[in-house]
Curated annotation (Swiss-Prot):
It is found in: Membrane. Residues 1-9, 71-93, 183-202 are cytoplasmic. The lineage of its organism: Eukaryota, Metazoa, Chordata, Craniata, Vertebrata. GO terms for cellular component: membrane. This is Transmembrane 4 L6 family member 1. Present in high molecular weight complexes in tumor cells. Interacts with SDCBP2. Keywords: Glycoprotein, Membrane, Transmembrane, Transmembrane helix. Glycans are attached at residues 129, 159. Belongs to the L6 tetraspanin family. The gene is TM4SF1. Residues 31-49, 115-161 are extracellular. The chain crosses the membrane at residues 10-30, 50-70, 94-114, 162-182. It is a multi-pass membrane protein.
Amino acid sequence: MCSSKCTRYIGHSLVVFAVLCIVANILLYFPNGETKYAYEDHLSRFVWFFAGIVGGGLLILLPAFVFLGLEGEDCCGCWSCENYGKRCTMLSSIMAALIGIAGSGYCVIVAALGLAEGPKCGDSHGMWNYTFANTDGQYLLDPTTWSKCHEPNNIVEWNVTLFSILLALGGLEFILCLIQVINGVLEGMCSYCCSHQQQYDC
């Protein structure tokens, strides 16, 4: 069972997704490219949870680099029974993947909550509040209500787009890390079987 190509592909993909998550999260701090809303604390509370920077970003880069570090390893030893050290290698990849699952899961949850609550925005009376907090996310299906937010301009579109990106990327990261966990378990079982086969051959 050769899994080096799969692990390498997962590692490279996670690096790309992690960078995109970090960028998306950073953009949430600057609606319309302006910094004043962050200084004045007029951003969604979930922006400050660092879901994309920490969860979908840094906690994904860790397993990604672990997987890329394994690409030079011989992961095809199951057929030739060259399995010494394989179990330790696979265990490290599983542990790294579990960290990735935790990080991506956090990213998905926070992004979903951010979408459900909606942005913090200024209404027609100049009051800042969560206009869509009590809609249970139904505002997402009715764009005609988005005009209730007067400031920042297009803040609903900004939040919906970026939180949706974080939600999608976090979901993809979760799936890839889960695949690597399954891959590592199967590789470990394969290595275990080979070690017993070696004993019988001796």
